[in-house]
A protein has these predicted regions:
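Short hydrophobic-aromatic micro-motifs
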Residues: 24, 51-52, 163-165, 197
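Disulfide-stabilized, aromatic/cysteine-rich ligand-recognition loop
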Residues: 38-49, 54-66, 70, 97-128, ...
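Short, well-ordered surface patches within globular domains
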Residues: 2-4, 58, 73-101, 113-158, ...
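Cytochrome P450 core scaffold surrounding the K-helix E-X-X-R motif
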Residues: 26-37, 58-65, 70-77, 166-181, ...
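Core domains of carbohydrate- and sulfate-ester-processing enzymes
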Residues: 12-22, 77-109, 183, 187-200
């Protein structure tokens, strides 16, 4: 996991796994604990798509950085480019150049990049720009959940590594009703100007890791262990 201080083994080759799409169901079934934003369970339609077998690595993202990804406005959403320019950003949070080589600040202090480790601490804008550079896109939350509910042997790092940005705006599911009182304050009033993240990170506490869990952050958030899983359209 990205919280580990021991360098991981070489990353497995990135492969693509296809899903037929069609009319599917997502959301919590109502059995066991879930937050109100995880339901109601409902049907949605998916076009055929492919999901990457693993998360994007530090080495892969470094190629984006070195290839001028932060200087190419064609790769960025308009608001993302304005934010990047205003902040003067040219690399991910916690990355530093030391004697010509990229390092990143970790829980064990400043360390050289571990190329096979998933890249984290990325905003939605950075994740989206990288996906465009890679000839791909970010998955929707329905695509992510549908894939994760299948036989996931070929699709790894779904949980416990990094929260994965989706291109889905954080909004209520069909039939959602804000609960009365203080309980309704938590999710209902935050359903605007944020994006959904799926999975969980190495820093996720117990009880916040399940197939239907919907995390959410504004597009500029970088402080969490947030990473990238790529998706592509088929047909």
């Amino acid at each position: 996991a990205v919280c580990d201080v021991v360098p991981p083994p070489v990353a497995a080759p990135l492969t693509w796994h296809s899903f037929d799409g069609g009319l599917i169901e997502i959301g919590h079934t109502g059995e066991g604990f879930a937050f109100d934003n995880e339901g109601p369970r409902h049907r949605t339609y998916l076009h055929p798509y492919a999901l990457a077998s693993r998360l994007v690595t530090q080495a892969e993202f470094a190629a984006f950085v070195e290839g001028g990804g932060y200087q190419n406005p064609m790769l960025w959403l308009a608001e993302g480019w304005d934010w990047r320019a205003a902040q003067g950003l040219n690399h991910p949070l916690y990355w530093h150049r030391v004697e010509g080589a990229w390092h990143h600040f970790t829980l064990a202090g400043l360390q050289p990049l571990q190329g096979s480790q998933p890249v984290v601490h990325l905003s939605y804008y950075e994740a989206d720009a990288y996906a465009r550079w890679a000839g791909s896109r970010l998955p929707t939350e329905a695509e992510w959940e549908h894939a994760a509910a299948q036989d996931t042997d070929p699709v790894v790092q779904l949980f416990g590594v990094a929260w994965q940005w989706t291109q889905s705006s954080y909004a209520p599911y069909p039939g959602f009703r804000v609960a009365e009182g203080a309980v309704g304050e938590y999710n209902g009033k935050f359903m605007v100007n944020q994006y959904v993240l799926r999975g969980s990170s190495c820093a996720t506490p117990p009880g916040h890791e399940r197939l239907t869990y919907r995390n959410f952050f504004p597009a500029t958030a970088r402080w969490q262990f947030t990473g990238i899983r790529l998706a592509r359209d088929l047909g």
